[in-house]
Amino acid sequence: MKAAEEATNVHIEWVEIPASGWKEKINIMFSTDSLPDAIIGAVDMAKNYEQLAELDEMLKEYAPNTTAFFESRDDYPTALYSPDGKIHTLPTGDEAIQNIIDSQLWINQKWLDNLGLQMPTTIDEFKEVLIAFRDKDPNGNGKADEIPFTFRDAWGWGGTIENLFGPFGVLETASHVFTKDGKVTFSAAEQGYYDALEWMNGLYKEGLFDKEAFTLSGDQYASRGAAGDNLGVVAGYRANEAGVVNETDYRAVPVLKGKDGTQ
């Protein structure tokens, strides 16, 4: 921040709020109308848009590149405007992979090659691959030490399995909310959500899921592959989130199709 101040000749007096007291402090600021000039924070502040300045004209005058970027995108206008039709807040515009994709499935291509298997494209093929990883010693060490599929229970962050709901017609997110046919929908109220859980429960019962997946901490997950070439499918922004021995052995699993072709 010091370098930014020197480059712009603008000094900023920062007010740091501990995460534990963030919500209370922000609520007091808005309720007493004692706001700083600008706030970097969570989206829930946007509900107080009437207390925030209108940015539309200022953006056009002082931020033409930002304005042009917004106008070039179909997805930004809906997110930008408050209920009064004005812009009061700005998104971060951070399109790093971890902000575009909550989590990706990565499969051990070397294991596929060792067993003469093709990349799975459907949930049935995916299950058959996991069974082969469990039963056919894909790492070739003569031991039943393979973990067909590992992830961690940290909903909405890397290492999780939200994308396995897609083949059942549900776009699962950390907030459990998605848009369906133009309407905001609660994912856990969809039949496809329960169908997905039932299918995944079957994988767990057959020993195709890592038995410790739901209790792994971030550090434990990061060292899951430390024992050697023992991981078949992992979840994360990158395969090395699970501590795989050789990340170059892993390839992204394509969007899987459900039994009726749903993706």
What spans do the regions from the language model cover?
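Extracytoplasmic/secretory soluble proteins
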Residues: 1-263
